[in-house]
């Protein structure tokens, strides 16, 4: 098992350096520079512009800039935002709990609906229920996040007035941050009104962000269950007189979840990329909205640091998924 973990962990190193290359060079393909953006419409004196480029090291050749950047990254220094002059890591850690809270709620939404829906579709194969679940899953998978988000806002916020449009909590509540997760912090402060406000603000973003993973998980669960339900040991269990519920719950589900666990790990990356659009639509003060604003400002350190930190997080989650996969399926960890 240790060898299996070490092998998976060693793959992170080249992936990490690949991410630094992408984060550094792709950003510089965007026209303009952050100094011009910082100056705004009033413009900036050419001499002052050249001096600021030198101060931020942007006057050096790109490869030299990358060498300086990677050296600082290896020391844990992601630089400072050109716009706010705050350390990138500090800004990221301040906003990250909001993104995690949204991503966790979206994943729970996807799991609690997607897995049961996939199981029911497999058990009721070729029935109206099966076709309905797969049809809805295909629709959810194909639906653009920005369109789905605007549609839900128009229906539930504008027309019906059931849910808030934007933000994490109503402006009339102030919660002292303890964990950074408003649902938890509002419970710790024993403020029920703040808790329900935070929960209501989560409803639409959770649905929008969780729809795509829900569709993928439902389809994968159905496919895995259908494959397992056709195995000989399942037919043997049924021949012994076990009820359909016991066959599915005790024998089929555990083996069917093996490929589903892998898909769940892959959906973590989908959640964080989807969070960029979702947070923008709902003005959710998280890392995704922060990165979108940094793109408009050409804030290189923020973009590089944010992309790198999110990439490391996704790699860490995928490593945990691989380890979990090896625990569930011993054949995987013994493969050379």
Q: What does each model-identified segment do?
A:
Residues 59-115:
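An internal, D/E-rich "acidic patch" concept
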Residues 16-21, 140-161, 263, 267:
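Hydrophobic alpha-helical membrane-insertion segments
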Residues 12, 95, 99, 135-142, ...:
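Residue-level signal for discrete positions within transmembrane alpha-helices
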Residues 6-12, 16:
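N-terminal signal-anchor/signal peptide hydrophobic helix marking the start
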Residues 2-4, 96-129, 145, 158, ...:
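Alpha-helical transmembrane segments of integral membrane proteins
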Residues 9, 52, 62-78, 88, ...:
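Hydrophobic alpha-helical segments of integral membrane proteins
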Residues 15-67, 156-194:
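Hydrophobic alpha-helical transmembrane segments of membrane transport/permease proteins
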């Amino acid at each position: 098992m240790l060898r299996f973990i070490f092998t998976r962990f060693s793959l992170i190193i080249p992936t990490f350096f690949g991410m630094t290359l992408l984060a550094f060079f792709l950003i510089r393909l965007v026209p303009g520079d952050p100094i011009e953006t910082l100056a705004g419409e009033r413009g900036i004196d050419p001499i002052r512009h050249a001096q600021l480029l030198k101060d931020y090291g942007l006057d050096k050749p790109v490869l030299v800039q990358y060498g300086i950047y990677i050296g600082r990254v290896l020391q844990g220094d992601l630089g400072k935002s050109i716009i706010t002059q705050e350390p990138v890591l500090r800004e990221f850690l301040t906003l990250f709990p909001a993104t995690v809270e949204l991503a966790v709620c979206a994943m729970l939404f996807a799991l609690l609906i997607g897995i049961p829906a996939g199981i029911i579709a497999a058990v009721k194969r070729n029935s109206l229920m099966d076709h309905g679940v797969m049809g809805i899953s295909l629709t959810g998978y194909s639906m653009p996040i920005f369109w789905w988000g605007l549609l839900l806002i128009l229906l539930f916020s504008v027309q019906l007035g059931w849910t808030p449009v934007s933000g994490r909590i109503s402006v009339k509540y102030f919660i002292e941050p303890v964990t950074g997760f408003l649902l938890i912090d509002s419970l710790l402060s024993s403020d029920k009104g703040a808790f329900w406000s935070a929960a209501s603000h989560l409803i639409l973003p959770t649905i929008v962000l969780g729809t795509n993973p829900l569709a993928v998980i439902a389809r994968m669960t159905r496919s895995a269950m259908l494959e397992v339900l056709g195995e000989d040991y399942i037919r043997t269990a049924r021949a012994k007189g076990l009820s359909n519920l016991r066959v599915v719950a005790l024998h089929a589900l555990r083996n069917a979840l093996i490929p589903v666990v892998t898909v769940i790990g892959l959906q973590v990356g989908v959640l964080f990329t989807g969070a960029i659009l979702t947070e923008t639509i709902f003005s959710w003060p998280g890392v995704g909205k922060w990165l979108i604003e940094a793109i408009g400002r050409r804030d290189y350190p923020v973009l590089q640091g944010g992309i790198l930190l999110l990439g490391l997080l996704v790699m860490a989650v995928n490593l945990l998924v691989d380890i979990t996969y090896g625990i569930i399926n011993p054949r995987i960890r013994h493969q050379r």
